[in-house]
């Protein structure tokens, strides 16, 4: 089979990775994508590392069963827990992960604190703490674990009073006037960007890693000579692990902007 015409696999613990897929479609409009959301087991951020590894390997096997030419782990928690093991196990296929976009936040050189919102597991993992240590001397960073936020997005709640109350409560431990930027360290969180901006104001820059990951994916495809050069719009197939998944597929398409 012509590798250039093979699809690209995307995986997340639920609907969050669609925020990355949304960017990837813009960067790679000719490619076909297969998206697998493991909403049945969401959220990953409060599970053990071993549990997340097992679920991530199962998801990658599912995608490989669909003859994908590359896999994007569009989940910060799964990247933290499993990316090294995945790359060691699947050496013949590019596996791209995602990490909190600390570098762009630091390079803004804005006065004030950089707040990193993520799941408890992402913030506890060595991979993230090594990344924090790398930039610690250049900016003041505050880690903000957000258990429960993924669940809002999984239900399709991306704005409104209930979500606003949750965010206000989480951010109440930090003086908002001292925040220069917010790094969204979970792929579910870009969907609540609008609500977050309402609370923090327009001067606070909100950054996520979706574009960086999509550009990295394109680089890997070029390197592997597997970029689809056909002049046609690609397709997207969405799968989800929930038993009755009609509603979550509908939410997924809505978040992706295809309905």
Swiss-Prot record:
<dbReference type="GO" id="GO:0009252">
    <property type="term" value="P:peptidoglycan biosynthetic process"/>
</dbReference>
<keyword id="KW-0133">Cell shape</keyword>
<dbReference type="InterPro" id="IPR018187">
    <property type="entry name" value="Asp/Glu_racemase_AS_1"/>
</dbReference>
<dbReference type="GO" id="GO:0071555">
    <property type="term" value="P:cell wall organization"/>
</dbReference>
<feature type="active site" description="Proton donor/acceptor">
    <location>
        <position position="75"/>
    </location>
</feature>
<feature type="active site" description="Proton donor/acceptor">
    <location>
        <position position="186"/>
    </location>
</feature>
<comment type="function">
    <text>Provides the (R)-glutamate required for cell wall biosynthesis.</text>
</comment>
<keyword id="KW-0413">Isomerase</keyword>
<dbReference type="InterPro" id="IPR015942">
    <property type="entry name" value="Asp/Glu/hydantoin_racemase"/>
</dbReference>
<comment type="similarity">
    <text>Belongs to the aspartate/glutamate racemases family.</text>
</comment>
<comment type="pathway">
    <text>Cell wall biogenesis; peptidoglycan biosynthesis.</text>
</comment>
<dbReference type="GO" id="GO:0008881">
    <property type="term" value="F:glutamate racemase activity"/>
</dbReference>
<keyword id="KW-0573">Peptidoglycan synthesis</keyword>
<feature type="binding site">
    <location>
        <begin position="76"/>
        <end position="77"/>
    </location>
    <ligand>
        <name>substrate</name>
    </ligand>
</feature>
<feature type="binding site">
    <location>
        <begin position="44"/>
        <end position="45"/>
    </location>
    <ligand>
        <name>substrate</name>
    </ligand>
</feature>
<dbReference type="InterPro" id="IPR004391">
    <property type="entry name" value="Glu_race"/>
</dbReference>
<dbReference type="Pfam" id="PF01177">
    <property type="entry name" value="Asp_Glu_race"/>
</dbReference>
<keyword id="KW-0961">Cell wall biogenesis/degradation</keyword>
<dbReference type="InterPro" id="IPR033134">
    <property type="entry name" value="Asp/Glu_racemase_AS_2"/>
</dbReference>
<dbReference type="InterPro" id="IPR001920">
    <property type="entry name" value="Asp/Glu_race"/>
</dbReference>
<feature type="binding site">
    <location>
        <begin position="12"/>
        <end position="13"/>
    </location>
    <ligand>
        <name>substrate</name>
    </ligand>
</feature>
<protein>
    <recommendedName>
        <fullName>Glutamate racemase</fullName>
        <ecNumber>5.1.1.3</ecNumber>
    </recommendedName>
</protein>
<dbReference type="GO" id="GO:0008360">
    <property type="term" value="P:regulation of cell shape"/>
</dbReference>
<feature type="binding site">
    <location>
        <begin position="187"/>
        <end position="188"/>
    </location>
    <ligand>
        <name>substrate</name>
    </ligand>
</feature>
